[in-house]
Amino acid sequence: MASAPRVSEVLTKKNLPPLSLYNFYIYIRDEENAIEFLDLFLDIMLHKFLFREHIRGLYKAGVTSTSLNTESSSTLGPHHFTRFRSASLSLEDLSTVYWPNFGPLLLEELSNEQTINSSDLLLSKDRAAYLKNLLTSNIQSLTQESTVISKEQVKMFTQIIIEKYFNPASPHEVMLPPQLVQPILDCKEHQRQDELRLFEDVETYLLNFLLKPAYYRFLNHKFKHNLNPLTCTGRFIIGYVSTFAAYWLGFCGIFLDYSRRKRVWTLLPFAFGFYNLICTWSKHDPVLALLGYSEVKPFHYEKVLQPSIRLSLNRRAIFVLSIIVLIVGANTAIFSCVPSIRL
């Protein structure tokens, strides 16, 4: 795994599949059952990004450093923003511009049904699928002079994050150490939701103690496996039934005195059965790997574009195929070559 990308590269969508943010999101959701933590981390990234864009907009508009310091300490009055009113983005525009870069940005609260693709997302609740279909090249540029983020918009985003993840009454509440949560709640009470470093300690905790360990498990999974666990369950059932049928046909061929030419056809159910059973055991489909594909969700495949991942999967595919051929060949030879006897 020496050539594997860092977790920061995956979280900022700078890497190729299967080590992509979309796949990492699916893994955290299905395997780690910690999707709320990843959602929170992505939304904190968005909070920092919006704050910096807000500061950049103030600089472009000619705000002095003194005014900027006053703004960051939450003492800047609303009259300073009247000059930017014609250039400010609406909240609906913000959801379409900033959401795609960072993934799950509380879309249920921030977007309306007229926003592109948002209505489908609200119905399906599949935020991971929305991540996959987005292309960074199609996102509106944030460097336009006409786009300015206001203080009120930053505070509104912050308020939504606090209410969703730190409110005990919220269904999406994340369980974090009290020493991390209490300062955030105190800022809410004192109306200081526009501070850049408000979520800094939470971000560090999530990255170092939750996301990095999960990412190493994600890497191990992608380097060794290319099947979804739900598919493995189905493959096990199919393989078990097929293998049972192969043994049943093999014994019938022996005790009903069938010729060896006929009994050799037990090769087919043995091959089909053991292929699925061993794929389930290894969570690896060798044919799929040699074709260069990996299963993300049940019956949903994507091309493996990461060279190191593809090389690792191909090596494992040869090993798994060797085991399958050995077991199938041994069973076929036994049931074909054993002398038959009519009972």
UniProtKB/Swiss-Prot annotation:
GO terms for biological process: cell division; protein localization. Its main location: membrane. Residues 109-228 form the RGS domain. It is a multi-pass membrane protein. Residues 257-263, 339-343 are extracellular. Keywords: Cell cycle, Cell division, Cell membrane, Endoplasmic reticulum, Membrane, Transmembrane, Transmembrane helix. Gene3D superfamilies: Regulator of G-protein Signalling 4, domain 2. Coiled coil: none annotated. It is found in: Cell membrane; Endoplasmic reticulum membrane. One of its GO terms (cellular component) is endoplasmic reticulum. Residues 1-235, 285-317 are cytoplasmic. Pfam families: RGS. The chain crosses the membrane at residues 236-256, 264-284, 318-338. May be involved in cell polarization and division. This is Protein rax1.
